[in-house]
């Protein structure tokens, strides 16, 4: 059952996307607060972009998809307790990368990408407000 408009909050998908897409300065401030650094300018790439690679494969729908300072950002509202956010983030990253680079382009053209989940719960149960995951290079022996 859907909520009436006046009952929607920032965490409802419709309102989350509506507020962040119609208020670019607020969206930029939210990114800066989460990332802990200034962003000069943002540019929306699309609203609730769906990326489907095959007709029978699992696609993704990006809530707030934007670019700023030569980086790409996807901001997702996560209201349910079902997580597996690390694998979901990895999947989103791959799908976004497939969508960002043209056939024959050099891999150096891939932009740095941030997948941000705004959660109503603590997905990793370590009592933290922000969790940061980065791909890192491990040395070989």
Regions found by a protein language model. Give the residues of each.
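Elongated, amphipathic alpha-helical interaction scaffolds
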Residues: 1-141
